[in-house]
Amino acid sequence: MMAAGAAVALALWLLLPAVGVGEAGPPPIQDGEFTFLLPAGRKQCFYQSAPANASLETEYQVIGGAGLDVDFTLESPQGVLLVSESRKADGVHTVEPTEAGDYRLCFDNSFSTISEKLVFFELIFDSFQDEEEVEGWAEAVEPEEMLDVKMEDIKESIETMRTRLERSIQMLTLLRAFEARDRNLQEDNLERVNFWSAANVAVLLLVAVLQVCTLKRFFHDKCPVPT
C-alpha cells in the first residue's frame, strides 16, 4: 500500500504544476506528459491546474492493448463537459481561453472486460511572458538609439527560437508515442503469426499421419492365406 501511494503521489507531482512556497498569485504554466496503464473495466481521471485566459491543448494516444481504443472526456473547472469521445485511438483538443481552476481528464476502459490499455497523453499550454519582467529587462539596458540592433528585434528572435524549440520537443514526444504504439502493434502481430503458423504446422503433421495410417489400412489384408 505504501508503494502504491508513493507511485500515485509521484504521478500527481509530475502532472500538476508546482506552486512556489510563499509566492502569491496563480501557479506557473507548465506542459506535462504522462504514460499510464489503464486496467480492464476501470476509469481513471487526472486533474490539471490552468490559469485564466490561456490556451490548453490536450493530445492522447492509446499505444498498447487490444483494439487500441479508449473513452475520453474533458471537463472544465465548473464541471461543464467540453469533450466526450467513445472508443478512440487518439485525439487532439484545444481549450481557448481557459478558466482558472482544475480541468478534469478521464480515460474510461469500462467497455473492455479483459484487455488493459497503455495510454499516453500530453498537456500543452501557450507560453506567456510576464510584461513586467520584459519591461524591467528593457530598462536595465542602454537606450535603443545607442544600440546597433533594437531590443524588440532581439526579443522577437529569442521568442521565435524558444517557440520553435518547444514545438520541436512536443513533436518529438508525439513521434515517440507513435513509435511505441507501432512497436506494440507489430509485436502483437508477430505473436499472432507465430501462433497460427505453429497451429498450421501441427495440423499438417496430423493430416500427414492420418493419411499414412489410412493408406496402410488399405493395403493391409486381414483375410488369412490358406497353406
From Swiss-Prot:
Residues 1-23 form the signal peptide. It is a single-pass type I membrane protein. It is found in: Cell membrane; Endoplasmic reticulum membrane; Golgi apparatus, cis-Golgi network membrane; Endoplasmic reticulum-Golgi intermediate compartment membrane. The chain crosses the membrane at residues 195-215. Its main location: membrane. The keyword Protein biosynthesis does not apply. GO terms for biological process: endoplasmic reticulum to Golgi vesicle-mediated transport; Golgi organization; intracellular protein transport. It comes from the Eukaryota. A motif (COPI vesicle coat-binding) lies at residues 218-227. Residues 43-125 form the GOLD domain. One of its GO terms (cellular component) is endoplasmic reticulum-Golgi intermediate compartment. Residues 25-194 are extracellular. SMART domains: EMP24_GP25L. A motif (COPII vesicle coat-binding) lies at residues 218-219. Keywords: Cell membrane, Coiled coil, Endoplasmic reticulum, Golgi apparatus, Membrane, Protein transport, Signal, Transmembrane, Transmembrane helix, Transport. Belongs to the EMP24/GP25L family. This is Transmembrane emp24 domain-containing protein 1.
